[in-house]
Structure formats: C-alpha cells, structure tokens
Amino acid sequence: GMHFFELAGPDLILGFDADPATRNVVGLIQADPELALKAVALRKFGQEIIRLVAGRRIHPTFAVPGGVNKSLKPEDRDTILKDIDEMIDITKLGLQIFKNWAEKNKEDIEKFAVFPTGYLGLTTPQNGLELYQGDIRLVGQDGRELEKFDASNYLDYIAEHVEDWSYLKFPYYKKMGYPQGVYRVGPLGRLNAVDHIDTPLANEEFMRYRSMNDGKPIENTLHYHYARLIETLFAIERTRVLLDDADILRKDILNTRHDFKNEGVGVIEAPRGTLFHHYIANESGLIEKVNLIVSTGHNNWSMSKAVDSVAKTYIHGQEINEGLLNRVEAAIRAHDPCLSCSTHAIGQMPMVVEIKDMQGNLINTLKRG
C-alpha cells in the first residue's frame, strides 16, 4: 500500500512529466488531501499490526529461535479486525485509481519496459498465491511450469552470473543458462507464477488481471503496480482469515527443544520479492557461512533491461529532459528495490544519462543529484 500511494503515486497521479518540485509525497498531499489521509491510514494499519503482534513498530524482536516471544491478546486481535473493512475499501480505491490511469495511458503501458522473462514465487500445493511457506514455482515466458521445488534445494536450480559492470550478481535458472534463464520476482513475478488466489476479492481481481493477456504472463513493467495492489487486497483478506482462527490466540509459542542443526535455508516473500537465506553454523552457534539471494538481486537483470528499454523507447535525437530521467527512475521504482525509498522521499535519485552516436562518441549528457 505504501509503495503504490507514496512512492508510485506521484508518477501516476501527478504525471511523469510533472514539476519535480511537486512530484513527491508532499505534492500528492496538496493535490488530494483526502486520498493522502487514506493512504496514511493504510500504512498505519500495517504498522499497528506489527506493534500489536510484535510489541513495537521499529525493529521488533518478535521472532526468536524456536518460535516467537509474544502471544496475541484477544483485545489486540479485535483491534485489528475492526479496521479490516475500511482497509479493503482503501485498497479497492487504489485499484480503481490505477485502472483509471491505465485506461488513459495505454500507450505508455504497452511500450514502457515490456519484455519476456521467467517468473518465480512461493505457491501453495495447488499453485495458489503464498507469502510464507510452500514450494518455489518457476514458470517460463509462456507461463508453463519449469520447476517446482523445496527452497532448501535452491542451489540445484538457481545460479548467479557476474558482469564486470555491476556489483550485484544476476540469478538465473541453471538448466536454461544465462541470460535465457533470467526471471522476475515480486508482485508481477508472483502473480505470473500462480494459478489463483485463495481469497475471494483478490482472486476476482486476479482473474481480471490475467485476462489482459489471455491467461499468459503479464510482461508490462508498469503492471507491477496493479499486481502489488491485488496482493495488498489478498494480505488484508488473509489477515481476517487468520484472526478468525481460534489458534491465533494460543499460548504455546516457543519450541524449547535444542536439537542441533548446523545448516538451514529459509525462504519468504517480501513485498519486493523472494528472499533466500542460507546459513551454516558451528556447534557454538557461530555462523561460518552465509548465502543470501534477495529480491533486488533476483530482479537485477530485469531492472537493467527496463532501464535500457525505457531509455531507448523515450530518447529521440539528442534531447533529453527531466521527464525522461524520471521515467528511467520509474522503471527501477516499479520493481520496488531497496533504493526506491529514496527516489521520492527526499527528492531525486542521482542519475547520469549519456547519449552516444553509433560510433560510441558522446554527444549529450544530462546529470542530476
């Protein structure tokens, strides 16, 4: 919710070419104060869940080895439940805003960083959307399943390519090699990797989403925003399902057995995509080896491709302007990497765009930040 309203909202609601002095969250508040308040309410709802479940909003210490350190109180459960209908309405409003924008900007959507890849995400046994447990499902460019595997075996399926121009590695599907085996994660990746969603409102919207390309994967980078809102709807509906389960109030929250296991692999879906955490420790509990593949890494190839595609689509001749730079930035921001928080919060992402002729001679440069 925060990403759509506060980070992507300035582009979609105010426009890619709006004055950068107002194309930010402050400008959004000035343009539509009521919408801004609803966006803040959705953000607050998520933060309150963290506080009530984990004890505090910032750096909670909820998860501990063997379980969690706090059970949920009945009154806290009821506090969360009472706001769910309002949060669903706010998310539906966001969906309507996006669809209205998409209707008016079809040309941009169809040419803004549209390219095929594979898609990867956690799924239920029936290939439904999952965020916390299940198997990893990888589908190809045509949407057909390539693999479905337990995350602990990720190294059998995923390798990482190195380019001399990037500090970040490029994960890919081993059997297809690089770059044929690259894939996307996050909202677009997850919704392309599943067949349905197990909550009614989100699944209804998901069916509309998938129908845009006759059931085949959605390749349009700007539809990351659409997928993100559908997932927000799912998360809110799923929250209600969990809170309505009596087991949510159980007090047995910690497994006190101490069977030593020196190696573990964890996987989870963060908002921006799939996280693999792989740890090896000695008998004293000291971590000796770590391997992480985080969502910004999974999406490294697609973000690079998106920047290249947007620049080639929107640069004509030698002229480049601030609106172009913002589109390049928006291509990165749609994937929601860790650096997206800085792109609207404090103003502008430092950026240099160079235009070269066919012989490689530099003919124009635009810098900012």
Predicted regions and their residues:
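Active-site bordering "gate/hinge" segments
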Residues: 1-272, 284, 294-369
